[in-house]
């Protein structure tokens, strides 16, 4: 299965997927395309260093979200993409992408959904909110992307301890290393090996 990874920054989750593929841990999946929402991001270098085709589709070059989403969908359809992975992709996508890839878009969110998710909860904001609330555990969630932000069916979750003296940066790093970089490749493997079905807004995993 051909995978497109959509990125907006440094691409640490992209690197986790690349490393997993090299270890044979993406099942029948192959990362075939990296799309960045802006030029010059380090994720593009990661793609180039590993021989993966990359393209830049900058949101500012399009009049509205619908046009941008149509261009995204067309680009991925032309490349024969089977699975779309949002890996730190901070640009909103719209109906053309959902319609082209129904139940075939995965996102990783740095919290245990339904906590600390939805509009405005991205990057360090998520971890700042978790620490302000005083939670004792946080973590990461991989879910299927739907039009409602962070509300799609949950594929995998992993909890991570919150330590008393954590800064947002400390918690972000721990969640990436202990959760995001583990469950994102695993969710991709499950999808590419045909283990995931969606019924009534819930994910069922076969034979695991």
Annotate each language-model stretch with its function.
Residues 1-208:
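One-carbon transfer enzymes
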């Amino acid at each position: 299965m051909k995978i497109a990874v959509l990125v907006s920054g440094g691409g640490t989750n992209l690197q986790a997927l690349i490393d997993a593929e090299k270890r044979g841990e993406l099942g029948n999946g192959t990362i075939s395309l990296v799309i960045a929402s802006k030029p010059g991001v380090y994720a593009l270098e990661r793609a180039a260093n590993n021989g993966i085709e990359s393209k830049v589709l900058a949101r500012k070059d399009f009049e509205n979200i619908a046009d941008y989403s149509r261009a995204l969908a067309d680009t991925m359809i032309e490349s024969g993409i089977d699975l779309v992975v949002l890996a730190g992709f901070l640009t909103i996508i719209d109906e053309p992408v959902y319609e082209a890839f129904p139940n075939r878009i995965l996102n990783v969110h740095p919290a245990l959904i339904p906590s600390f998710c939805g509009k405005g909860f991205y990057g360090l904001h998520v971890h700042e909110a978790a620490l302000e609330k005083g939670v004792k555990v946080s973590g990461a969630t991989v879910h299927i992307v739907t039009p409602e932000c962070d509300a799609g069916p949950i594929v995998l979750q992993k909890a991570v301890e919150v330590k008393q003296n954590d800064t947002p940066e400390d918690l972000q790093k721990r969640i990436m290393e202990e959760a995001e970089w583990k469950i994102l490749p695993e969710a991709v493997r499950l999808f590419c090996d045909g283990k995931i079905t969606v019924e009534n807004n819930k994910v069922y995993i076969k034979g695991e």
